[in-house]
Amino acid sequence: MATKAFQKIYTQLEAITKATVALRAQGISNDELAVVDGRLAQVVKTKGDLVTLQVFSGTEGIPTNAEVTFLGAPPTLKVSDELAGRFFDAYGKPLDGGPEVEGKEVQIGGPSVNPYKRKQPSQIIPTGIAGIDLNNTLVSGQKIPFFADPDQPYNNVMAQVALRADVDKIILGGMGLTNDDYLYFKQEFEAAGALDKIISFVNTTEQPPVERLLIPDMALTAAEYFAVEKNEKVL
């Protein structure tokens, strides 16, 4: 994300912790992105003119006179049909070596669709996995978290759900996946010929853990685009 020439540069930090920095700045909004000493950060708190920024890659080595530039907007995602079949990082940047996506730029973490205006979810999405279909039935429009210990075959279960579900699009958000897990999903979807209906946002163990906080909002933004604007069945 490029820094504009007219943006003010701050060079005096009030405080530095392991994950955050604080400084005095005017006219700053919550969730706004910034660059601190060349590292991407996000506003997590404002109190008067005291602004606290969470630095995604950590603050180690950042001096008190580091340059800070505010980018004037929160994280965004470009949404279009070009998202289909692609793997992205927590910032919506391609992980798969493909080109940047062109489309409408949408703020992530913004207001979601009002649940009172939605029809009550009732359309069953069969997965072919008896333990899920009988005991924890999935329905269209549902967000589904998978929690598992590292030694559990969660990637196999998630891939089966994605490949068996009768839907138009599958939005997968992976937090703290190993590089092997990421490659497993990519290879499974490609081998099954289903890659064109999968959109994945992945944070691997090699990337800063705090970036994982962006993954759910990225996935939800993509899901609402395909479900609401494209009128597709999305899981």
Where do the protein language model's features map onto the residues?
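Switch/coupling sub-region of P-loop NTPases
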Residues: 130-157, 163-235
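Acidic-enriched and Gly/Ser
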Residues: 2-8, 12, 16-17, 22-127
